[in-house]
Amino acid sequence: MKSLLVVAAVLAVGALAQGDDAKGPKVTDKVYFDMEIGGKPIGRIVIGLFGKTVPKTATNFIELAKKPKGEGYPGSKFHRVIADFMIQGGDFTRGDGTGGRSIYGEKFADENFKLKHYGAGWLSMANAGADTNGSQFFITTVKTPWLDGRHVVFGKILEGMDVVRKIEQTEKLPGDRPKQDVIIAASGHIAVDTPFSVEREAVV
């Protein structure tokens, strides 16, 4: 009887773990971006970060969001915008996609590829190949499975997908560069008292 109870307990724990996993990754922290286009406020984006699944990548993003202008995300641009694909930012050193750096040094290794690009509204690290993560990131505006296993997914939009869409639809110059500067006017960290799961699906 004891052995049967042990087996039942193990199965129950396994079922709970699977159920939790089925709900999706857990948000442990939030970061906000107050956005401007051409100097005019367009709203706030709030991003949930998965600090248990990708702690090193999430911490890098949080710390860069907390830094002052010129040392992190505040004042930096979304320098590359492609409709029906993604919006890319985070190059706070050069502003054109050739710069940026992490809190760990110039670059850091890919943490893992446990999460995928499930649809619009997922946050992932931009890179120049394997193990070249710095500060640049992108937010998907469609499902992008061809990026799975190549870019580290570490967050999801919780609020402000309409702001992401405004950025996506902004007028562009050759090279996918916005005609008017798309600026993170302010950014910061929002603590999460109790981590919560998000679905593995697109943000509407």
From Swiss-Prot:
Membrane-spanning segments: none
Enzyme class label: isomerase
Highest taxon listed in the record's lineage: Eukaryota
Catalytic activity: [protein]-peptidylproline (omega=180) = [protein]-peptidylproline (omega=0)
Factors inducing expression: Inhibited by cyclosporin.
InterPro entries found in the cross-reference section: Cyclophilin-like_dom_sf (IPR029000), Cyclophilin-type_PPIase (IPR024936), Cyclophilin-type_PPIase_CS (IPR020892), Cyclophilin-type_PPIase_dom (IPR002130)
Tissue expression profile of the protein: Embryonic, larval and adult gut cells.
Coiled coil: none
GO BP terms: protein folding
The protein's Enzyme Commission number: 5.2.1.8
Keywords carried by this UniProt record: Cytoplasm, Glycoprotein, Isomerase, Rotamase, Signal
Secretion signal, residue range per the UniProt entry: 1-22
MF terms (GO), sorted A to Z: cyclosporin A binding; peptidyl-prolyl cis-trans isomerase activity
PPIase cyclophilin-type domain segment(s): 32-189
Places the protein is found: Cytoplasm
GO annotation, cellular component aspect: cytoplasm; intracellular membrane-bounded organelle
Family the entry assigns: Belongs to the cyclophilin-type PPIase family.
Protein purpose: PPIases accelerate the folding of proteins. It catalyzes the cis-trans isomerization of proline imidic peptide bonds in oligopeptides.
Protein name: Peptidyl-prolyl cis-trans isomerase 5
Species per Swiss-Prot/TrEMBL record: Caenorhabditis elegans
Gene symbol of the encoding locus: cyn-5
